[in-house]
Amino acid sequence: MDIQKVVFVNKQLNTRMAGLLRLPEGFNLSENYPAVVVTGPMLSVKEQAQSVYAERLTAAGFVTLVFDGTYFGESEGMPRQQELPDVKESDIEGAVDFLASLPYVDAERIGGLGICGSGSYMSVAGVKESRLKAITAIVPAIADISKSAMTGFFRPENEVRAAKEAYEQGRGELTYLNFMPRAFDEGAAYYYSSRGTHPRWSNQVVAWSQLELVKYNVVNIMREMTKPYLVITGENAWSREASTEVFDAVPHSNKEMHVIPEASHFDMYDLAPFVSEAFEFIIPFFKKSL
């Protein structure tokens, strides 16, 4: 497989995005290939879990694109480390723009796969972006953040708003939330080990991100989903309840949900036995839907 560094643009924000484009073995420029945009967990960079899934998809014949979101990794955007749902959605739109512009990609056969937080972002993109024809969500973790354990990482709203105002007026420094403390054993086993660590990854997120995250209700949006939809979660995933809520909100019957036995949330990022089992569903789903 051929892996190319690429740059494309989020047209809404006019930010330059850094991506990795994977082309299948035996790639032929004259053919039209199905393609999948693959996005990773909140705060992630393109070399992490999303590349695990992209490699397997490309090995099965799909062109894939992973990228650093605006404000993260090698992509543009200031201040750094802002996790904003509307920006994540516009990043996905920019990725679809890029794939659709490639002469060897069939613009009518572009799908999306998202993991963890972006399992939810990608699901919403499936509602809003008409060029995405099918969506797979791996351990989607966001249903309604205002009711989730994620709020345990948040600070008092008035404190965050005051800090944001002070920064914007030049009177204060950026304040951050820690979204992956080392005390969270399961997450630490991924992010603070060779499995998931990366020099451009940080567990810090600009605190005012919570002001947008807390309003993000994926369940309400998914009631308008019309695309083929696949959800994969783990039997022991802390996100399983949210994944089920998101899946249940989809009103049509062209959807499927599979629970991988014994798998935890972070097991589904990269561990071969669990990811391999997930791909027993992912590849047939995309081959049928794209």
Region locations from a protein language model:
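Alpha/beta-hydrolase active-site loop
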Residues: 82-103
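Catalytic histidine-centered segment of alpha/beta-hydrolase-like enzymes
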Residues: 263-276
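The serine-hydrolase catalytic nucleophile loop
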Residues: 43-55, 69, 242-243
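N-terminal cap/lid segment of alpha/beta-hydrolase-fold proteins
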Residues: 1-31
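Conserved alpha/beta-hydrolase
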Residues: 56-76
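Alpha/beta-hydrolase fold nucleophile elbow
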Residues: 104-116
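Alpha/beta-hydrolase-fold enzymes
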Residues: 123-194
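Short beta-strand/loop motif that positions the catalytic acidic residue
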Residues: 225, 231-233
